[in-house]
Amino acid sequence: MFMSVVNFCGQLSNTQQFDQIRINIASPDQVRSWSFGEVTKPETINYRTFKPEKDGLFCARIFGPVKDYECLCGKYKRMKNRGITCEKCGVEVTVSRVRRERMGHIELAAPVAHIWFLKSLPSRISTLLDMTMRDIEKILYFENYVVVDPGLSILQKGELLTEEELQKAKDKYGEDAFTASIGAEVIQQMLKELDFSKLKQELYEELQTTSSEVKKKKLVKRLKLVEDFLESENKPEWMIMDVLPVIPPEIRPLVMLDGGRFATSDLNELYRRVINRNNRLKKLIESKAPDIIVRNEKRMLQEAVDALFDNGRRGRAAKNANKRPFKSLSDMLKGKQGRFRQNLLGKRVDYSGRSVIVVGPELKLHQCGLPKKMALELFKPFIYSKLELYGIATTIKAAKKMVEAEKSEVWDVLEEVIREHPVLLNRAPTLHRLGIQAFEPLLIEGKAIQLHPLVCTAFNADFDGDQMAVHIPLSIEAQLEARVFMMSTNNILSPANGRPIIVPDKDIVLGLYYLTLAFDNEVGAGMMFSDLAEMEHALYNKFITIHTKIKYRRNQLNAEGKMVPVIIDTTYGRLMVGELLPSNPNIEFKFINKQLTKKDISLVIDLVYRHCGQKATVIFADQLMKLGFKYACSSGISFGMDDMVVPESKSTHINETQLEIQEFEQQYSNGLITYGEKYNKVVDAWSRCTDRVANDMMKEIATPPVNDDPNHQRINAIYMMAISGARGSFQQIKQLGGMRGLMTKSNGQIIQTPIISNFKEGLTEFECFNSANGMRKGQIDTALKTASSGYLTRKLVDVAQDCIITEKDCGTDKGIEVKSVIEGGEVIVPLAEKILGRTAAIDIFHPVTNDLILNKGELISEAKLEQIESAGLDRIMIKSVLTCESTTGICSICYGRDLATGTLVSEGEAIGVIAAQSIGEPGTQLTMRTFHIGGAATKGAEVSSVDASYDAKVKIISRNVVINSEERKIVMSRNCELLLLDNNGNEKARHKIPYGARLLVDDGDMVIKTQKLAEWDPYTIPIITEKSGKVLFKDMVEGITIRDVTDEATGIPSKVIIESKQYSRGAELRPRIQLLGAKGEVITLSNGLEARYYLPVGAVLSVEDGVQISVGDIIARIPKESTTTKDITGGLPRVAELVEARRPKDHAVIAEIDGRVEFGKDYKSKRRIIIHPIDETMSIEYMVPKGKHVVVNEGDFVKKGDLLIDGNPVLQDILKVMGVEVLANYIVKEVQAVYRLQGVKIDDKHIEVIIRQMLQKVEVTDSGGTTLLAGEKIDRHEFDEINAKAMKNGLKPAEAQLILQGITKASLQTRSFISAASFQETTRVLTEAAIAGKVDKLRGLKENVIVGRLVPAGTGYFMDKMRKAAIKLDEENV
């Protein structure tokens, strides 16, 4: 194993062509065959002559010459003696590079266990020998003896004996009656004696007979290990080493420092310890030293080898003089500084430089400004060759001198060299692929790189001192790739959502907004013009301004492509933008004939790209930028104190709210509401107040004061910046001129007293103190967030890196159904947005005319979308990566459109990495918690009613209503939904109506927009009767199940259900209310059950014992917790929780079958919920903690997948109960909800790619006739292959169920051990792989980068394909 790892980290010469890498345990003979000689002395180099000592760790005879073609004693020098071995010093004359490749070895005087196989959990040695690791350690480290052969004694084989016990046994049975031994030798002997085929048979038989689950698991593990050894042809005794490899000296160098001291690699020190102890042990054995001394030396040798392989894994780590632990071989591979991540996945490259960036507004989109000095340094070799070619310099040396002197000819040559030679610019952190783009360099004076303003969004760059790196693609292929794939002009659309990313921002937006403003009473209003020159003339002579409303005759292309004149109302400013538009019938002037905000500009750029192509878009964007900058400058927009307007109505609103709050305080003192309810109401009232003040302020800012002075600023500058999308948000303006509003404490709880002042008025000391807490929390969150966001991205990339488009069509008929996302009655994401760029899974017909709209497998383009929308389809079957059936990778048809180009994705595209980047890149914008804007709380008022958002017809699903004494309709169903339908019967909105709500409309009613449909109390959950009768309290014992809680503040008592203590001989009390009829019998409800209402802990009673109540009355209320104690995991942690498939805190419980609910007998602190299915088969029981809020009542009918307990459901449960599609929909919905809150748009398909990677494995439930074991987890495709083989041989196929894995686990269990090792837990992965003799087929990106080949994506994919085809042809020809 050792050599494979070394070889694989060494440089590979071009002659070695390979397709896969295999890892094995190295046998002693193999180690000796690699070696060029035995290292017997611990010396390194001679401190006087600085030559390596003979037979030492740097010996030239073993490892090769120190200088090229020169032996150590200097007898043979130069090339002519190549290959000769010097007879005097024994050194072969060759290149010194061999000191990086040649290995040595140490013959150990006693065998030593390899610590990876001993201590890497689960310990392989202990599993094989079926002993505990502790016992194995006792034997290895010479604490206990082990019985190898019990002979005539009654001792057991494998039994451990201490020194005294051994002595007693010898006295009892005689010296030779049994054999017991100690140390690594005995372990080696025991491993040698294992007969794997026999052991396999025994384990298999035992597995069939045993019934204990724990034992089964243990047997399966052992069986798996035995099978691994059998298949890989590794011998178990190789886990104990007789010979130790010594890695090449150049890999563990010894360097001389200035002061004559030496710096050495820790490995040399660790090797020296091993050699010293080994030599001492040899001497002790030769001199027949006492057993106890020899044994101690053997133990020390074992410890020295342990430290060399993995320092600190067992016992105390070996430390140097400065008390710093030595860096062992394992540490060389592990972690961020290890070989994998530091040198193989991330390399430093030459031909690169970095400098500060400045803005380059006069550049074209494909250009960047490169400082002359920098270019001269970067392009040196190119300049030398050109100087020589033109005969300006005679030799390279002369050319070098000329460049150093910076002669004038050099600059001319440099100009020529860089012409059309793209350079790559990169800004760290590179969070997505647009963080590296190619530009054509322009030589500039100065020392800073100039960057085009429009690419700043993609780089996330600003000019406050950011630095960027420049890289030069050298080969012609690299230049070609840079130009075709990476040029900034080829990256107009964002790969995350397919929208333009080259959009004007900040100043440009402000300039364009100013330019397209139109004012009413301007000079020359209503004038008519026929061409632009005429208008320019009028503008120059001040007959009009750029904002004057005028009429203009403009020639436009119609649908047939002919020019037709139209008269339009516009302004000169808007016409200037209009002039830049490419002529196309689909791009009408109306798109820009308005006040252009950032959103509008983005839409126009998108339209231009879709209809006129890339070149037109680039030219348009560039011209737009120049225009925007020009007018941002000439508008002279600035703002002062007076632009922050404080609305006059502010004091009124505040006074009203304070009165409202006094009322709540009064209600609380009178005991009408609880503290939690009061808190909620106060927070709500202040939220509403803040919003009202903000709205009034917005109105005042938006309508500027009337003033006849022509030089007077007619529109508020701050308002202009916010409304145009240039800078700032209304949230910020609210705090400048309105009121700051409610603040949060650091634990996320909202402080009841808001900050009434704004920044213009200034905060009082107390307000300042109040807001500091939330602000600091925000600052700290930001600092912590960056790291966890980066880590999430890394895990996502790792899990998805081998997801590549490998074929055009996998031919599957499967797909997923999508519909628009409707929340709270509003369409949040329309269907069009979800299906654009996907492919249809079935033929799609018009529901009325039955015309074919889409063929199966056809891409849904913008044109097709219009047809789908006009047909009024509300759900569609599309293909998805989740249902793709390609064995390696994914097919184009299932993936759909490549968002960055707007066409069908091409083969070889690394969609996994793109998906990971798209989800990870906005990660830093996501909050750690959902509530903050500089500490200000953004909490909407609680929803307590539903209004109609359209004129529509009402449809009520699962309507179960009772009419109460006030003639109101009360909802009694737990899953009542109210739908609003349009004239065609298509769903426009959907609202969930909670239990206990008052319905104000009924099924089939027609409603108008804004009409109230239902209302309820948002702070409590009621328990309502559906029959009238007399109340009877059961099991309500004062102080045991019920308590009078007197509110401290008010002194008003109320009866509250409490946790019941064990009572009277263990009879469990279950507090409930029964309804009695006229004769005192218990009333029967409509579902056939008796009218018994069980009360949960914390319920507050609303009725007295013995009173008469009527239908729809509230018996008790369960208060909802105050807003934040039920902490919503928001932002980044929620995304991580979903993709890691963790169990959420306070998770929900879902019903696994359809059936009726019954509460069984409680058990200790748990409630028992039983679901009886309708067909009277097996009922299912759930045990839930008593404090949890159960959302069902006894007798309720629940459907499979309904929640029994509130909270976030566990993903594994959804998969088990509802299947893959529902699970995928849920994850997509939840992840999107987090990003949507931050205004980030990500295409669903990226999340689907990650989900596909999480669903790679299946768990075997029945092994059938295959070699698989029940409970074994195996790759889906491997499982299918094994089954196909079994069926071919006429055996029963195995059965398995899909399992969901978190991304970390999925990354570690990928098929490629190289990729897994470079991710996390390197030693464990490599240990496992070596034992199983795993083969890495090098299919993913990471493993290819690590072995230094082209990645099998993009152009590399086709190179790979061509190479394989060529090899196949050659084989056929042979």
UniProtKB/Swiss-Prot annotation:
Catalyzed chemical reaction(s): RNA(n) + a ribonucleoside 5'-triphosphate = RNA(n+1) + diphosphate
Gene Ontology terms, MF aspect: DNA binding; DNA-directed RNA polymerase activity; magnesium ion binding; zinc ion binding
Sites where the protein binds Mg(2+): D462, D464, D466
Record Pfam families: RNA_pol_Rpb1_1 (PF04997), RNA_pol_Rpb1_2 (PF00623), RNA_pol_Rpb1_3 (PF04983), RNA_pol_Rpb1_4 (PF05000), RNA_pol_Rpb1_5 (PF04998)
Domain of life assignment: Bacteria
Disulphide bonds in the chain: none
Free-text remark on how the cofactor is bound: Binds 1 Mg(2+) ion per subunit. Binds 2 Zn(2+) ions per subunit.
Chain residues that bind Zn(2+) 2: C810, C884, C891, C894
Family matches, as SUPFAM superfamilies: beta and beta-prime subunits of DNA dependent RNA-polymerase
This enzyme's EC code(s): 2.7.7.6
Cofactor(s) in the UniProt record: Mg(2+); Zn(2+)
Keywords, comma-separated and alphabetical: DNA-directed RNA polymerase, Magnesium, Metal-binding, Nucleotidyltransferase, Transcription, Transferase, Zinc
InterPro entries per the UniProt record, alphabetical: DNA-dir_RpoC_beta_prime, DNA-dir_RpoC_beta_prime_bact, RNA_pol_asu, RNA_pol_N, RNA_pol_Rpb1_1, RNA_pol_Rpb1_3, RNA_pol_Rpb1_3_sf, RNA_pol_Rpb1_4
EC supergroup of this enzyme: transferase
NCBIfam families: rpoC_TIGR
Family designation: Belongs to the RNA polymerase beta' chain family.
Subunit organization: The RNAP catalytic core consists of 2 alpha, 1 beta, 1 beta' and 1 omega subunit. When a sigma factor is associated with the core the holoenzyme is formed, which can initiate transcription.
Protein role: DNA-dependent RNA polymerase catalyzes the transcription of DNA into RNA using the four ribonucleoside triphosphates as substrates.
This protein's name: DNA-directed RNA polymerase subunit beta'
Organism the protein comes from: Rickettsia massiliae (strain Mtu5)
